[in-house]
Amino acid sequence: MKHNGSRTCLNRRSRFGSRERDWLREDVKRGCVYLYGADTTTATTTTSSSSSSSSSSDLHLVLCTVETPASEICAGEGRESLYLQLHGDLVRRLEPSERPLQIVYDYLSRLGFEDPVRIQEEATNPDLSCMIRFYGEKPCQMDHLDRILLSGIYNVRKGKTQLHKWAERLVVLCGTCLIVSSVKDCQTGKMHILPLVGGKIEEVKRRQHSLAFSSAGAQAQTYHVSFETLAEYQRWQRQASKVVSQRMSTVDLSCYSLEEVPEHLFYSQDITYLNLRHNFMQLERPGGLDTLHKFSQLKGLNLSHNKLGLFPVLLCEISTLTELSLSCNGFHDLPSQIGKLLNLQTLSLDGNGLTALPDELGNLRQLTSLGISFNDFRHIPEVLEKLTMLDKVAMAGNRLEVLNLGALTRMSQVKHVDLRMNHLKTVITENMEGNKHITHMDLRDNQLTDLDLSSLCSLEQLHCERNQLRELTLSGFSLRTLYASWNRLTAVNVYPVPSLLTSLELSQNLLECVPDWACEAKKLEILDISHNLLTEVPMRILSSLSLRKLMVGHNHIHVLPALVEHIPLEVLDIQHNTLSRLPDTLFSKALNLRYLNASANSLESLPSACAGEESLSVLQLLYLTSNLLTDQCIPVLVGHPHLRVLHLANNQLQTFPASKLNKLEQLEELNLSGNKLTAIPTTIANCKRLHTLVAHANNISIFPEILQLPQIQFVDLSCNDLTEILIPEALPATLQDLDLTGNTNLVLEHKTLDMFSHITALKIDQKPLPATDSAVTSTFWSHGLAEMAGQRNKLCVSALAMDNFAEGVGAVYGMFDGDRNEELPRLLQCTMADVLLEEVQHSTNDTVFMTNTFLVSHRKLGMAGQKLGSSALLCYIRPDTADPTSSFSLTVANVGMCQAVLCRGGKPVPLSKVFSLEHDPEEAQRVKDQKAIITEDNKVNGVTCCTRLLGCTYLYPWILPKPHIASTPLTIQDELLILGNKALWEHLSYLEAVNAVRHVQDPLAAAKKLCTLAQSYGCQDNVGAMVVYLNIGEEGCTCEMNGLTLPGPVGFASTAALKDTPKPTTPSSSSGIASEFSSEMSTSEVSSEVGSTASDEHNTVGLEASLLPRPERRCSLHPASSAGVFQRQPSCATFSSNQSDNGLDSDDDQPVEGVITNGSRVEVEVDIHCCRGREPESSPPLPKNSSNACSEERARGAGFGIRRQNSVNSGILLPANRDKMELQKSPSTSCLYGKKLSNGSIVPLEDSLNLIEVATEAPKRKTGYFAAPTQLEPEDQFVVPRDLEEEVKEQMKQHQEGRPEPEPRGEERTEPLEEFDTAL
């Protein structure tokens, strides 16, 4: 069999044969390449393996090895060339010597896969085509072609008069010109060129689908063109309108995968700026870069990101160039001919491998801006001293270790110097001569310990954040702005006093006092000196007549000085200090104060808002969370009639006087959570502008009158004592989120739920099942989740919580933050647990299965993950098999900026790594080595500050999905686990978060408290927090038979009988041991929508894997039996998200008990993943004395009941001795596979597993699934008529007499009834 170059066509019914699988297994260097055909109707930017428009004949499977070159595959396929597309983006031609399979293997290896066998398996997965794909022909997208060139044979008439006749001519619109041939369908004759820039395009009314093209100028020419169809007319009008509207002759051909300049573009001789960035331009070929000199008026040329490798020397012949960009092309040197570009003013060479510049560069006397950032320079090139007009030098991301100020002094005209992200450790001053021309300097992210720039007497702005500075010395003659945060500064010296200074940022340092010179700065408007060691605020600072914004939070300030005179202060942040009171004259003297944050202090009272009868306060935002305020402070708030935001959470409020709340008419957001309030005043109805009310964790028993407010949007009354809701006849249309969880006594009728049908998010508790019917839940952990949108209009944070996972003794918790997108967090929320469940059965090594879980989830994002990205955090608790002294181990993996913190013995233990450029120097260096461009706002290519994410595949190899992994055994000292997104940890320290929730009994209230604290401390973004309470005892046994006394030969079959029981040969659909080699792949799998795998169940396992029984985990007290049993393992998951529009719509219309589908979406806690007990697949018939034997077993405490899995909400119990033949008729036992839905999702057929699908039958909302109580309609209850009562009692009596003896009570029964959730 010939494998290299052989072709196998895959269609929706053909399969990956056993012969091919056997051949692949023989050597890991063998594999297959999916070869796609070109389809001009399919967009290259959105193509994927899920593209339904690609016919089966366009997809071929080529078996090859890592040594097979592209030329050999082309020969076998009858192709001229192969093309490679990465991440649905650009398409480049492969060189004949390149090896496609090796390219795939290298790609997977760089993503994070290490095992060669796993790399071979992943390479055969058709879903990979969303990230890397091969074409036999170059694909073209029609709208791309339209923007490059429009052509066709149309009826044309020259001139505005009707003297000329209509004639068919070849018409081309390319670049800035309209080209009309003199002969029909011929380009060899004379071509008439009509420049369109500055001209006009008009509709010809007398002729249908006709346009009049006119050039600019006094002697303008006009051509009338008649099109055959409306679509052609619109295409030409749209493209021509862009050309005529330009002021300059600019042509943008970026991101078109071009290898050469279109031939007709050379007719546009008036082009002044040509953009060819992000293409694959060739040097020597017709239309290549060597022909660009034909544009005689070209002034600007952008050739960045073309992977040229060598500098195009012929570009130096274009003497008219004033702007040239050649960034990210892999240059290692520049030719001497570059000195010919005498008119060049701007030269960008960023992202290459340059180590030196030629001396001829000094000839460019007109050069004003030079960009050589992210190269390999170790010193400032001397040739720059010859550039007398040079104004800006950008050398960020190089390898400079020493900064010689003398070299900068010799550059007489340089004003802006960018040296951030180098390796600077020392600054050398050659002489005392001052430098009078440098005004802006950026030294961020270096390794400086001391910095003396006093010789730069004209310095206006300095950035030196994130160094290791202990002392900073500057000249104050011209200083206007200073940014020196995130250092170790103990002294900042500026002389003379900076009279022009307007902004000063010194946060995150070790300063013990405000510098004296700062107190004397007469124009200082902004001062941020938070996160230092201050003990006081100087009177001169607080009484400054120029200061408008003062940030002194997170210090040790005990008291603020009293104000004597009026001050212009507008923003005051004094949070996290030790203040017991505020100055009495604060509000009366600071009449411009609009924002005050005094949270996390020890305030017991507030100063009066006015000295006289009338208040002049303009205060709008007031944050007083976590103080010692009582009811006595409420009357003072009335003096601030313009308050819009008021936070009084976590104080000691017991009442809120109705008369006082009535006067806060401008109030828009009110947070009263964490107090001791029993009611919200009825006068809240007068706050007509109120849109947010947060009052969780109080003692409120009466629902406030907030549903009459016209603008109310968000209401959080969770963790209170509500018993009922009084709602008006009509609810406000603006209401989006109503949280009533944690109100254990609250019962909502169906009529009430119907009235909330329009609410995006209705959060209520699920009605608990009776104690005798409830399933066995974990006593080792419980969780609470809170998510708040903040000031943004959508929630881009989702969470995953499974208290019972896999075998029922594990748990999985996750947090996903999409920053600005909400799609990816929801996809990860729905898929990642399934991927983990599959991966833990492939490997027991935590590093391996966690890494593979993230990488596979990255792949499953499909097209959605090409341009979007998300931070991800996953925590997996499982039995610890490696450490016999520990019951459970915790494995945490993360990418991005979501973090997990473990509270151990009252102290925080961080388990995550922050993958950002600012916090991880190693990752920043990796990104720099890959020659990425890091913009001044510290973002990779201006997109994200994270270096590792799930998604954002188009930023490969700079952004990777490989996670950081940490494992630790859980001990009795581990109290809780906190998961939070970026916004949470930006505003709360690890220690404060742990201390805030350690003594909160309810995990839901704890999570809510963390989010409230973050918002009160200044967070305006989405914030998400999950708190997992741990109860890991030393006596905890984690084996599968813990707490279960095995029944004797009556309760279950005997051991001998079990040995004879045949093992199941049908694999479980949830066992997760899926392989591309052991399972059959069809084209339907290849063509399935990768982006719609949000609810995919685990793949069908191979036959070989299914025959291997999984050994049961037992301890020495509960030895394993000699016979294995089989059971499908669902899980119990609680999903929380902000929208259910994630591809999970179900085809099943069967109603489910306990789920209210009244038009609004509700959150439902469902069992879909974990098993809580085991059951034999079959057992022999019971002996005749089975009833007596069962009674004896119950007397010994070994009795138990099995709850039907397909009646999880009804709580029906089946006795263990029920006839098995009846059970086998259940769909949940007779079918082990899932049901294929129309969207490609796989769901099992059990009712309990369809709960999540039924929940999504509700109209699509923005906030996911929420817990709804299970309530029976009154008419559904069983009612016995009076005339039949006696007859029914007699029948029940006879039925009881026919039953076995009841179980003994009291001391005879020592153990409670055990109950297990099984697949039955």
Curated annotation (Swiss-Prot):
Ranges of compositional bias, category Low complexity: 1066-1094
Binding site for Mn(2+) 2: 817, 982, 1021
Compartments (UniProt record): Cytoplasm; Membrane; Nucleus
Domain PPM-type phosphatase: 782-1030
Residues with PTM Phosphoserine: 1207
Reaction catalyzed: O-phospho-L-seryl-[protein] + H2O = L-seryl-[protein] + phosphate; O-phospho-L-threonyl-[protein] + H2O = L-threonyl-[protein] + phosphate
Coiled coil feature spans: none
MF terms in GO: metal ion binding; protein serine/threonine phosphatase activity
Regulation: Inhibited by AKT1, AKT2 and AKT3. Activated by oleic acid and arachidonic acid.
CDD domains listed in its UniProt record: PH_PHLPP-like, PP2Cc, RA_PHLPP2
Enzyme Commission identifier(s): 3.1.3.16
Record membrane topology: Peripheral membrane protein
LRR repeat windows: 247-268, 270-293, 297-318, 320-341, 343-364, 366-388, 389-409, 413-434, 437-457, 458-477, 478-499, 500-521, 523-544, 546-567, 568-589, 592-613, 618-641, 642-663, 666-687, 689-710, 711-732, 734-755
Necessary cofactors: Mn(2+)
Tissue: Expressed in the retina.
Keywords per UniProt: Cytoplasm, Hydrolase, Leucine-rich repeat, Manganese, Membrane, Metal-binding, Nucleus, Phosphoprotein, Protein phosphatase, Repeat, Tumor suppressor
Purpose: Protein phosphatase involved in regulation of Akt and PKC signaling. Mediates dephosphorylation in the C-terminal domain hydrophobic motif of members of the AGC Ser/Thr protein kinase family; specifically acts on 'Ser-473' of AKT1, 'Ser-660' of PRKCB isoform beta-II and 'Ser-657' of PRKCA. Akt regulates the balance between cell survival and apoptosis through a cascade that primarily alters the function of transcription factors that regulate pro- and antiapoptotic genes. Dephosphorylation of 'Ser-473' of Akt triggers apoptosis and decreases cell proliferation.
Subunit field text: Interacts with AKT1, AKT3 and PRKCB. Interacts with STK4, RPS6KB1, RAF1. Interacts with FKBP5; FKBP5 acts as a scaffold for PHLPP2 and Akt. Interacts with NHERF1; NHERF1 scaffolds a heterotrimeric complex with PTEN.
Protein name per its UniProtKB record: PH domain leucine-rich repeat-containing protein phosphatase 2
Species of provenance: Mus musculus (Mouse)
